[in-house]
């Protein structure tokens, strides 16, 4: 039988429609037959009981607001009839709960790219990174040129990363740009990187080179467009050298403990808090139990299982 609704927590007094439910639909929830008084769109809530004005609406086991007016069992509960409980200042003390993961450790591996500095990438790409937004045009041309020459084979991707920064930046703003670009240049998913500068920007290529610290000079090349006669030809020459290196990289077995996964916020629809988020939470629990790392971006209104950061 098709599941048409989901009651997330035993304490909830609303349920979520998994598919659009028509008015008059009869559903049995916890042994009680409920008749919907109106159509309830997929992902939206309907009342499991009669609500008095001001009574809390419980979802995920916690109040998500209160009823603006009296509502009947089977009514569609939405932003028009639910009012937030938030008002004024809220006193809050962070009291973390210690949770033990009952997940056995397994000697698992994944196929990754071991870099010279010991870092591990899950992809092997050629990146073109500008020190300043003024060279965005040429880096896009270079990326397209290398894709045409290679047919996109030999590496996972050939990527240009244009941005609008690096020129006339000062202070912390300038330092933050440098830090972000440095982390990109040294990222283990980049098998080779061409850093392209103009020559007159605040983020001077020579200074940025020193800012990088130690790096593999066979895998990171620099080009300053004002110092070359033909920036396209010079850029392609450097990219061919970089591509030659990166295209010979091979995946090797890497302990799962070295895997780092970043979780990105999704569409934030009516289902993400009850489908994707819990699944990613369980995956993160497992990964962390193996010694790996999971970094999560979540909304308070879309809870997952406990997430841990190693």
Task: Tell what function each PLM region has.
Residues 14, 20-22, 41-44, 50-66, ...:
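Alpha/propeptide regions of enzymes that mature by internal proteolysis
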Residues 1-37:
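Extended boundary segments
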Residues 124, 264-271:
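Glycine-rich phosphate/diphosphate-binding loops and the adjacent beta-loop-alpha structural elements
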Residues 56-58, 63-127, 141:
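Short, glycine/charged-enriched hinge/interface segments at domain edges or termini
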Residues 105-156, 161, 168, 284:
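Phosphate-binding glycine-rich loops and their immediate beta-loop-alpha structural context
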Residues 298-310:
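Single conserved hydrophobic/aromatic residue that forms the stacking wall/gate
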Residues 272-278:
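Active-site glycine- and acidic-residue-rich loops that bind
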Residues 288-296:
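Mobile "lid/hinge" segments at catalytic clefts and subdomain interfaces of large enzymes
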């Amino acid at each position: 039988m098709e599941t048409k609704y989901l009651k997330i927590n035993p304490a909830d007094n609303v349920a979520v429609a998994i598919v659009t439910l028509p008015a008059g639909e009869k559903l049995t929830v916890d042994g009680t037959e409920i008749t919907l008084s109106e159509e309830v769109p997929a992902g939206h809530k309907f009342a499991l009981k009669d609500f008095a004005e001001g009574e809390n609406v419980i979802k995920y086991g916690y109040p998500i607001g209160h009823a603006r007016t009296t509502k009947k069992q089977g009514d569609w509960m939405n932003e028009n009839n639910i009012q937030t409980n938030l008002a004024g200042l809220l006193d809050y003390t962070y009291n973390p709960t210690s949770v033990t993961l009952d997940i056995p450790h397994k000697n698992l591996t994944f196929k990754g790219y071991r870099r010279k500095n010991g870092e591990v990438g899950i992809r092997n790409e050629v990146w073109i990174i500008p020190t300043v937004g003024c060279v965005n045009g040429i880096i896009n041309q270079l990326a397209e040129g290398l894709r045409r020459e290679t047919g996109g084979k030999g590496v996972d991707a050939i990527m240009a990363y244009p941005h609008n920064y690096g020129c006339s930046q000062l202070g912390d703003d300038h330092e933050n740009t440098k830090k972000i670009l440095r982390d990109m240049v040294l990222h283990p998913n980049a098998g080779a990187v061409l850093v392209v500068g103009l020559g007159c920007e605040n983020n001077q290529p020579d200074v940025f080179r020193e800012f990088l610290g130690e790096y593999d000079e066979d895998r990171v090349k620099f080009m300053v467009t004002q110092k070359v006669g033909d920036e396209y030809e010079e850029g392609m020459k450097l990219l061919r050298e970089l591509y030659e290196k990166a295209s010979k990289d091979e995946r090797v077995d890497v302990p799962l403990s070295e895997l780092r996964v970043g979780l990105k916020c999704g569409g934030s629809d009516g289902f993400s808090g009850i489908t994707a988020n819990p699944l990613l939470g369980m995956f993160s629990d497992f990964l962390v139990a193996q010694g790996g790392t999971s970094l999560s971006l979540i909304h308070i209104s879309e809870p997952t299982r406990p997430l841990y950061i190693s």
